[in-house]
Amino acid sequence: MKDSIVLYSALGRGHLVSMVELGKLILSHHPSLSITILFLTPPPNQDTPTSPTAFTCDATAKYIAAVTAATPSITFHRIPQISIPTVLPPMALTFELCRATGHHLRRILTSISQTSNLKAIVLDFMNYSAARVTNTLQIPTYFYYTSGASTLAVLFQQIIIHQNNTKSIKDLNMHLLIPGLPKIHTDDMPEQVQDRENEGYEVFIDIATCMRDSDGVIVNTFEAMEGRVMEAFNEGLMEGPTPPLFCIGPVISSAPCRVDDDGCLSWLDSQPSHSVVFLSFGSMGRFSRTQLREIAIGLEKSEQRFLWVVRSEFEEGDSVEPPSLDELLPEGFLERTKGKGMVLRDWAPQAAILSHDSVGGFVTHCGWNSVLEAVCEGVPMVAWPLYAEQKLNKVILVEEMKVGLAVKQNKDGLVSSTELGDRVRELMDSDRGKEIRQKIFKMKMSANEAMAKGGSSIMALNRLVEVWREH
């Protein structure tokens, strides 16, 4: 029987794509393995096109068909859809769906074990509750952590903080000292772990504990990018036990989308090399009209060329139809900046834009996939974190890696036009900006080396597969 590995994706298209890319990477170096990807779909009453967990059947079926045709050694297995009567927020739905389908997971894994040598299962870290099933079945259990090693170190440290304190993190008002990392203020910890009374707090303690107690964690980073913290892990300097780590990144989409329906790539073709700053904040990065206007004024003040993806919050009084750009932005802004800037609604081919020679800077929400895309293309960043672990990523990018600048927010979370304009100008047109550009160019070279034959990430992948075959 063939040796097989199961990858279990969390709910949502982005999570599925991450697992597919991991599967493709494994097979490109170890084609004798068979890979099965398990995926979840939302309950019928909670699959809306605008939901962050949206998983429309047609789009998913087309994506899976394309992957299967290109990579026959990857097979897909959908966890049967179940009903959850209570409408839950996206993150809570993700956790609950995995927990509530444990009996289906047990049946599927038992079936796979009867037709192949099931060597290991890799869980998306959001599917942490599946470890209870896999441990009962005595299947070696690994986690795929799609962020970096630095935030993983902070996640493990959260267990120690929980054990040693009765206060919530938000009340500590202190800097955390974690081996291999710069000082991290408690204000920069993820919102979900700030407050012990937050319903997500215990979940993240459980996630950290399950990952720490697993057979290993696969991390989407590379040694040269997070060298100090990886050295701390490898030398056993972390407080408390840690599992084996395998840094196999950067794993990002292997084929940048070249769709140019809005003409942005053609527009970039007409701009000077490294002259355009790109602003995009992820699928959940929506701003109030007040903030959008501050961004617009700041870009105009900066006098830099720009390509900006605008996503607006739904505000009371808005009609079903989204407001036009003219309604959202300052009067005359589009006309005044049409020679220097381009504004898009809701979406842009980010990977293709970042790889374009005209792009010289990236204002980002610091989502890890976006960070990796920027690093792989050597594009320096302005860090504007919005949610999840993004404040931690900002600290690492700015204080540790020194490949970006951070914007300052006021007490209401607003970034002023002056602040944004100054940071954009500093990144694009200053000596400090040049230093940052040189640093991230070196990091780009290191990323290429890590994924080349004999590189650190490929060697880590080979070690991982050796361990799997020994199970």
UniProtKB/Swiss-Prot annotation:
SUPFAM superfamilies: UDP-Glycosyltransferase/glycogen phosphorylase (SSF53756). It is an enzyme of class 2 (transferase). Disulfide bonds: none annotated. UDP-alpha-D-glucose binds at residues 146, 348, 350, 365, 368-370, 373, 389-390. Keywords: Glycosyltransferase, Transferase. The active site is at residues 15, 124. Its EC number is 2.4.1.170. Transmembrane segments: none annotated. GO terms for molecular function: isoflavone 7-O-glucosyltransferase activity. PANTHER family: GLYCOSYLTRANSFERASE, ISOFLAVONE 7-O-GLUCOSYLTRANSFERASE 1. Induction: Up-regulated by methyl jasmonate. Belongs to the UDP-glycosyltransferase family. This is UDP-glycosyltransferase 1. The gene is UGT1.
